[in-house]
Amino acid sequence: MTKKKVIIVGSGISGLSAAYYLYKKFNVKIFEQNEYLGGHTHTHTIKINQELVNVDSGFIVFNNFNYKNFIQFIQKLKIKYQISNMSFSVTNRQKKYEWSGKNFKSIFLSKNSLTLRYWRVLKDIFKFNKLTKQYINSEIVSKETVSQFLSSNKFSKEFLDFYFYPMCASIWSNPVGKIKNFKIHFILSFFSNHGLINIIKKRPIWYTISNGSKSYVEKIFKLVGEKNFIHEKVLKINQQKKYIITSKGRKYKFDHAIIATHTDSAKKILGKITLDQKKLLNMVKYRGNTAIMHTDTSVMPKNKNNWSSWNFLNRKKNFALTYWMNLLQNLTIDKNIFVSINCDDKIKKNKIIKKIKYSHPVFSNKTQDIKNKLNEVQGVNGVWFAGAWQGYGFHEDGLKSALRIVKKIR
C-alpha cells in the first residue's frame, strides 16, 4: 500500500517531533530554509584553547515538572542529559544594585540584605506567590493585564524593578513594555506550573542535554533519513490542489502539510489563506532579538558571587540577558562562554564568537481564543499548524502541538 505523503515545513522541535512520530507510517519530507536543522535548537561547535566544545544558543534547559513529553521523547531516542543549574541574577547599574538567587549566601549574606529595598523585594515575592495560589483557578483576574493586577495589589516598585519584570522579560525574551500587557492569568499559570512560587519545597530539577542539544536533532536526522530533509525554502502552499512550491521551483504534492513555523512565516506561504486561518495566525506576533556568543565578562554582575546561569541587566530601552553557558551546560573549559540577548553595544568586538538572530512570540490576551480557533482550522484542506506559540512558547509546547496533530492523522 502506498504511504500517504506528509510535508513538514520547519525543523524546530515541532517539525522534528512530528517527523519522528510519523516517518514509519507515512512518506515524510521536512523542508528547512536555514543552513542548519533545529530552529531554536541551535548548537555551535567552537574552538577554545585547541579544544572543540559544543555550546547552545537557543534551547538550553528543561525540567522534570513541565517537560514530561520532551523527556519521554529524548529517552526514546536514547539521548543523554545531565543536571543543570537555573540560578538568576539582576543588575541595575544606574541604581548600583545587584542581587542573585544562586544560593543562601548570595540571598541573605550579601550587602543588599542590609537595605530596606531588598527586604521589600523579598516580602513581595512571598506576597506574589501567595496571591498566585489564591487566584490561579479564579475567574476574578481572568481579564486583567499584568500591569492592572500588580497595580491593584499594590506591589512595591522594588519588587517590579528588581524581580518580577526582569524575571518575565528573561523568560519570554520580551521587553518590560510588552510584558505589562500580557494577561496576568497566563503569567500566574506559568509561575505555578513551573514551581516558581515554591521557595524551598517542590522545586523542579533542571537538566541540559549532554554535549549540546543538537544531539537529538542528529538522531532524528539519521532515523528519518537524510534524503527526507530538504534545504529549500517553501514559497507557497496550494491548499486546494495540495502541493507546495520551493525556492528552487520544485513542486511537491501532499496529503497532509504540517506548518511548523512562526505564525508570520506561515501567513506568507499559505496560498488563498482562509479567513479563519488568518485570524488564528494574527493572534500571535513575533519580535526579533539578537543573541551574541562571546567571552566578555563586562555584562556580568560586578560581584562574581552573583554570577548566575541567567543574568538580567537593566537597560532603559530594552532588556538585556546573559546566559553563563559554563554553569548551564557544565562546560569543563577554562574560559567563560556567554550568550547575551540585546547586548550588541555592550560587548567588545574582539570578544565576540558569533551573532545569531532569533524571533520570539509576543503573547496577547487571546490564549483561549487561540485554542478555539485552532480546533476550527486544524486539518482543513489537509493543512495543520504546529508550534510552541500554541502554549507558553517553549520546547514542551512545540512538542505537544506536534503530538496533537500526530494523534489526529496517524
Where are the model-predicted features located?
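Mobile amphipathic helical/loop "lid" adjacent to a hydrophobic cofactor/ligand pocket
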Residues: 64-189
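N-terminal Rossmann-like FAD-binding beta1-loop-alpha1 element of flavoenzymes
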Residues: 4-30
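Helical element adjacent to the flavin cofactor pocket in flavoenzyme catalytic cores
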Residues: 187-243, 247, 252
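Conserved Rossmann-like nucleotide-cofactor binding loop
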Residues: 14, 36, 264
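Glycine-rich FAD pyrophosphate-binding loop
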Residues: 23-47
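N-terminal glycine-rich dinucleotide-binding loop that anchors FAD/FMN and/or NAD(P) in oxidoreductases
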Residues: 44-70
